[in-house]
């Protein structure tokens, strides 16, 4: 199941060398680009398209810290997006409501400064979450990591909403 890590010759871990990921991606994408197989057999062309698709999927997954964490959990048999991991701690739920309220008010008032401040706050929360994920994986505390992935998905979604409003 650690196929993506194997493809990129990376040790399965949350904390990876993203520069190495990028370089390996470029090399793999160039090597298996479907255009290089234009004069090959139909079978080889199909294989190149499938390989190119797998490379792109793997890169997108490993590049995004939350997707990488979810994928890493799956390699350990834990589905972070399963219903049993959807509950949030009461403190995080309260914080979610505050952030949503701030976002609604800033949108309604077309307050770009508040939106930028909220975006900075959420980015800082994401950085803290990534540090927490690193620690959870180091301790092999996969239940906590699964909850952190769900929190990270919320933060990603909220930042996307903020970006749309800016």
Curated annotation (Swiss-Prot):
Keywords: Chaperone
SMART domains: DnaJ
Gene3D superfamilies linked: DnaJ domain (1.10.287.110), HscB, C-terminal domain (1.20.1280.20)
Residues making up the signal peptide according to the UniProt record: none
Gene Ontology CC: one annotated term: iron-sulfur cluster transfer complex
Protein's GO biological process: [2Fe-2S] cluster assembly; protein complex oligomerization; protein folding
GO MF term (any one): protein-folding chaperone binding
Family matches, as Pfam families: DnaJ (PF00226), HSCB_C (PF07743)
J domain ranges (all copies): 3-75
Domain of life: Bacteria
NCBIfam families linked: hscB
Main function: Co-chaperone involved in the maturation of iron-sulfur cluster-containing proteins. Seems to help targeting proteins to be folded toward HscA.
The family this protein is said to belong to: Belongs to the HscB family.
Self-association and partners: Interacts with HscA and stimulates its ATPase activity.
Official protein name in the record: Co-chaperone protein HscB homolog
Lineage: Bacteria, Pseudomonadati, Pseudomonadota, Betaproteobacteria, Neisseriales
């Amino acid at each position: 199941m650690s196929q993506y890590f194997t493809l990129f010759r990376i040790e399965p871990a949350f904390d990876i060398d993203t520069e190495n990921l990028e370089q390996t991606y470029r090399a793999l994408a160039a090597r298996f680009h479907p255009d290089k197989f234009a004069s090959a057999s139909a079978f080889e062309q199909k294989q190149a398209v499938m390989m190119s698709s797998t490379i792109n999927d793997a890169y997108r997954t490993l590049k995004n810290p939350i997707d990488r964490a979810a994928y890493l959990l799956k390699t350990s048999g834990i589905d972070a997006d399963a219903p049993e991991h959807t509950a949030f701690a009461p403190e995080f739920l309260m914080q979610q409501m505050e952030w949503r309220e701030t976002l609604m008010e800033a949108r309604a008032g077309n307050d770009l400064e508040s939106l930028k401040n909220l975006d900075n706050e959420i980015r800082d929360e994401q950085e803290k979450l990534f540090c927490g994920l690193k620690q959870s994986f180091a301790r092999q505390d996969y239940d906590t990591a699964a909850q952190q992935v769900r929190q990270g998905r919320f933060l990603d979604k909220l930042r996307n909403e903020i970006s749309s409003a800016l």
